[in-house]
């Protein structure tokens, strides 16, 4: 019999951005229950809008950054950008900004040497690899601009993989 090596236990990270909720809705609770209950981490990339969303998501292992539409209670709790380590990977997180040049180049400059850059703001889902980096935007749960409603799932094991879940 041949031998094989099993993939080490992968880490599941649910990624939200641009929820733009003034209060937690039943629909958001249902989405979170479905996708986050077995997640190892939950990341929110800003524009939570209300601190009630931040408070609600703290029932999960939560990381996050603030966005341009967040109220002061959220901005005081969260940085505008941060880098976390998951397994052997460095992951940069920011909300993003109204940038009209080469967005990927601007993000690359902001997060030198990371394996992945997670960002929101555009409400457009994106999963692309370029120059050895993963660029990942989960889109928006409630107001996708042209790309529909979505969230993201990162799977971290031997590799770092991103997937968009259409809602």
Model-derived regions: residue spans:
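N-terminal active-site segment of His-dependent metallophosphoesterases
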Residues: 2-56, 60, 70-80, 88, ...
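Binuclear metal-dependent phosphoesterase catalytic core
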Residues: 10, 16, 86-87, 109-113, ...
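A generic membrane alpha-helix/interface feature
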Residues: 35-36, 106, 157
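Glycine-rich loops and low-complexity Gly/Arg-rich segments
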Residues: 38-42, 67-70, 87-91, 116-120, ...
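A short helix->loop->beta-strand "cap" motif at the edges of active sites that frequently abuts
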Residues: 60-62, 132-133
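Active-site-proximal segments of metal-dependent phosphoesterases and phosphodiesterases across multiple
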Residues: 70-112, 142-147
């Amino acid at each position: 019999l041949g031998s094989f090596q099993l993939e080490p236990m992968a880490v599941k990270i649910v990624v939200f951005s641009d929820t733009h909720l003034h209060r937690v809705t039943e629909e958001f609770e249902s989405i979170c229950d479905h996708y986050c209950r077995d997640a190892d981490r939950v990341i929110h990339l800003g524009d939570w809008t209300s601190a009630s969303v931040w408070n609600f998501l703290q029932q999960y292992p939560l990381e996050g950054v603030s966005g341009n539409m967040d109220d002061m209670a959220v901005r005081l709790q969260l940085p505008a950008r941060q880098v976390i380590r998951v397994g052997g990977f460095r992951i940069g997180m920011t909300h993003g900004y109204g940038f009209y040049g080469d967005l990927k180049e601007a993000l690359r400059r902001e997060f030198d040497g990371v394996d992945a850059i997670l960002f929101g703001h555009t409400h457009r889902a994106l999963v692309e690899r370029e120059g050895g980096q993963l660029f990942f935007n989960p889109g928006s749960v409630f107001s996708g601009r042209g790309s529909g409603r979505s969230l993201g799932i990162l799977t971290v094991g031997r590799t770092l993989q991103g997937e968009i879940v259409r809602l």
